[in-house]
Amino acid sequence: MNEETLFGSEKVTERDMLDRLNNRYASSNGNGLRYARAEHVRVTAGFDARRICDYMALDLWPGGYGTKRTGPMLHGHEVKVSRSDWLTELRDPEKAEAFRRYCDFWWLVVSEKSIVKVGELPIGWGLMVAVGDSVRVVARADRNLAVEPMTRDVQATFARAVTKTTMRLDRREDPALRTFARQMHLTERTSS
């Protein structure tokens, strides 16, 4: 993303927005991390990746019990930090569809609410807006009841992106990784 918007007096970049998404999905308990977080998931495993999903978060907690069990849910995110970038997205609906079909929920994530005008949000999409160091849901996404199974290429690129994202996050700074490291006894020991 080349364009940036101002958030307060600072320019907001895609990296800033991805950090906010990582904060939103930083959660864990005794069973481990709640979300597998992945930045920049490609549609193919090779070099010819024309389509990239900005961010995916797979909820690893099953949700519900018995017949109401929902199973893990995949959230896909398209990040926009400028109005012109959003308008480009609207002109090419196939870009989002390359990934949306695999997701239970699809979100547009913007640095400012003014990037999206009333009536522009495609049917079924949710909207998240930057607030502080995280994002807040402004419009809930509809659940996609016709989720398609991921191709082997997308499975591979998702796994690679989860690994890269987890390695990039600092376990001292990321609350989910910090808790998980403590539970797994992976905390750094200091000499006395």
Functional labels for PLM-detected ranges:
Residues M1-Y35, A45-G46, V118-S192:
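Non-catalytic C-terminal interaction segments of nucleic acid-processing enzymes
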Residues R15, I52-D54, L90-P93:
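Short amphipathic alpha-helical segment that frequently serves as the phosphate-/nucleotide-binding helix
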Residues R42-T44, P62, S82, K113-I115, ...:
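Short, solvent-exposed loop/turn segments at secondary-structure junctions
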Residues Y55-G66, K80-W86, R171-E173:
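Short low-complexity stretches enriched in small and charged residues
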Residues G71-I123:
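Catalytic cores of nucleic-acid endonucleases
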